[in-house]
Structure formats: C-alpha cells, structure tokens
C-alpha cells in the first residue's frame, strides 16, 4: 500500500515534468539562469559583427565618438598594425579629455608572438592611456597558469558595449599562414545590459589597479545616443526590445555558470541545436546532454574546424566529434581556415555570443563572459551564418573520417582526449 504522502509527491513531480515539457526552451532557460543569479533585461539592441573587419570598423567608429570614457578588457592586444591604429585612436580621445582605461591578461600577452613589452606600456601611458596587466606571469609560472582573464569587453561612455570571441590582432582580418582565414563572431549591445558589462569591467579594473572607479557617470542613463549614429544599425523588428542576460564567470565566485548555461540550454532544446566552438574538448555532462538531445529527436549540428592555432587540443576535438557523429550528431568540418567562434543556437529562439570555449580552461578556470540573447530574429541571423558556413565544410561520416584522419592521428586523438580535463 503506497502512502498518501508518497502519492502526492509523485503527482507533484509529474506535474512539474509536464509543466517543463509545455514550457518553451527560451522561457525555460531564462527561468533557470535567473535562479542562478543572471539578470535579464528587455530593452536591448544587439548587432552581430561577423568578421574582424566589421568588428574593428564599428568599434573604432564608436570610440571616435566617445565623450567621457572608453574601457577595454582583452585577453591580449597583439602588438601589430590593428593595435597601433587602436592605440592611436585611444591616445587621440585621451588628449580630448576622455578617460581611457585598458586591461590585458599577462598570460595572454606572453603567449602571443607579438606581446606588449614594458617599453610599449610606458609609451602608451605617456600618451594618456591607462593600461594595466592582469596577473603578470612571473617565476615559477605555475601559480599563473590558471584563472586567466579571457574576457573581451569594450564599453564606451557607459552606453555602447562590445563583446564576443575576438581579441585585438591583425589575423582577425588577414588570417595567418598556418591556419588561413580566421573566422570569429562579436556583437555590439546597447541597452540595460551595457551596465552589466560596465560593472564587470570596473570590478576587475579596481581589483588590478587598486583604484576606486565608481559613479553614475559610468552607467547608462537617459542621455541621447544620437552621437553614435555612425554605427551599423540593428535592423531587426525587435531592435530596442531584445531580452539579453550576461553570464559572468569569475573563479571561486561563479565557477559553474558557463557549463551550467550550456548544459541547461542543451537539455531545454526541443527541436534544434546549432553549436560552433573551436576547442570542443567537452566534459562528460555536456557529452551526455548532447546524446540525450539526439535521443529526444532534437536535430543537433556541431561545427568545428579542420585547422587550429594550437597543438593537441584539435586532436581531442576530432576524437570527440567522431564519437558524437556515431551517436547521431551532425558534424560539419569547416575547411577554409580556423573557426574561432563560440556560439550556440537553440530551437531558433535564443543564442549566445561570448568568450567562453567548451574546454576545461573556460569551464573550470578562467574569467569568461557570454551574452545570452533571447530573440528569434538575432538567433535566425546567427543560424543563417551557420548554414552559410556549411557550404565551406564537409559532413563527417565514417567514410570522410577515414579520409580525414590516419590511424596514427586517430591514436593521437584518443590519447589527447585522456588529457581533456587539462586542455
């Protein structure tokens, strides 16, 4: 005989499950992420910037109109021609009385082949640019491997913000000899969530510099934005009314927020998932979520590159996507260059653009930031770009897999996947 309390508990669980099934994936992800502390606002515009040229043209145009402050937070500024153009523009704005603050990661700087050196930093400071290094790498190095600042945030006058996957480097426009063209994604946000991105920047700026930057002047008010009329417009009907939430991963504070979002987004899917990520080393939870989505009848498409900028990690990626392919995931292998984009689209209803990779560094260690965009029109724009890139990709099958990877390479992939928790 089942006790009445047990029956009530079972009925309640059933009702909750039925309610979840009837709830759209977009409203479900908003509800679940709000429970984890993510705030959403409804008054945003979002413009996708789909190439390096488009990103830098738009961002430079916005900086050129700045009146009060320009804040930049990047993993690295590669010391090349695009950085020279940026620093010249920032110095010009500083001479006009605009507060210019720039932050870069010490490991990110040292790990690129054209780092900013002390003499460069001195010269920039002499030109009025406040620039600081987050956690400089020093002997014995080990303590500085983890908890890097991998975010890419720019906020101008507290009214316009940029975020996504691109740092500052020529190769986002010109590509490289090793990987060819460099494909990536950025976006410009206007609206309430600019305040969230500004708060993220100011918090880490004050931590690094031990300053006390604060005040209403750094946050979006009711001022006219007419002086930013030179930027690429948001052509969606939903412009100015898009729901956006910012996921901010801080070590020891919000450790699980990025993996939680991706897991919940995949689990909430009912019809389709389109995913691009350059370092798809994944963890067990995400692999299971993707498998279960396929079992539910969700069309799951994943795109990764045949080229990469680092060793070993791509071998792990290829091993993973081959396993996923055998489990029913449609895998596209992008060929023209390196797809460094970090996006997911779910059910055509919501998407994310940001800095987070799906590897151990982003999910377990680094400072990261992604924008959740709950808007069908923006998601459709991103989805159309995904479909366009399929024309430059081949679909992974048993036959194409054997042509793509030699037995030796397959073994390296198997070995690399054992190292996934550290890649």
Predicted features along the sequence, with ranges:
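Charged, low-complexity intrinsically disordered terminal segments
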Residues: 20-423
